[in-house]
């Protein structure tokens, strides 16, 4: 296992970690008006690209 030769400064550590942040997920609004993730089936109505993909029951 590799061992560092010199201590990394707080500045160098911060520069290395500057790209480690968590990305905020993109949100779009379905034709039913509910927010959903792009390229995924809408969890509330079950449509994808304007087509009914998942049959939703009314007893929910």
UniProtKB/Swiss-Prot annotation:
<dbReference type="GO" id="GO:0006412">
    <property type="term" value="P:translation"/>
</dbReference>
<keyword id="KW-0687">Ribonucleoprotein</keyword>
<dbReference type="GO" id="GO:0015934">
    <property type="term" value="C:large ribosomal subunit"/>
</dbReference>
<keyword id="KW-0689">Ribosomal protein</keyword>
<dbReference type="Pfam" id="PF01783">
    <property type="entry name" value="Ribosomal_L32p"/>
</dbReference>
<protein>
    <recommendedName>
        <fullName>Large ribosomal subunit protein bL32</fullName>
    </recommendedName>
</protein>
<dbReference type="InterPro" id="IPR011332">
    <property type="entry name" value="Ribosomal_zn-bd"/>
</dbReference>
<dbReference type="InterPro" id="IPR044957">
    <property type="entry name" value="Ribosomal_bL32_bact"/>
</dbReference>
<dbReference type="InterPro" id="IPR002677">
    <property type="entry name" value="Ribosomal_bL32"/>
</dbReference>
<comment type="similarity">
    <text>Belongs to the bacterial ribosomal protein bL32 family.</text>
</comment>
<dbReference type="GO" id="GO:0003735">
    <property type="term" value="F:structural constituent of ribosome"/>
</dbReference>
């Amino acid at each position: 296992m590799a061992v560092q030769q010199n201590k990394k400064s707080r500045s160098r550590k911060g520069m290395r970690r500057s790209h480690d942040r968590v990305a905020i997920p993109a949100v779009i609004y379905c034709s039913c008006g509910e927010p959903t993730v792009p390229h995924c089936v809408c969890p509330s109505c079950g449509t994808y690209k304007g087509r009914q993909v998942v049959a939703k029951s009314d007893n929910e």
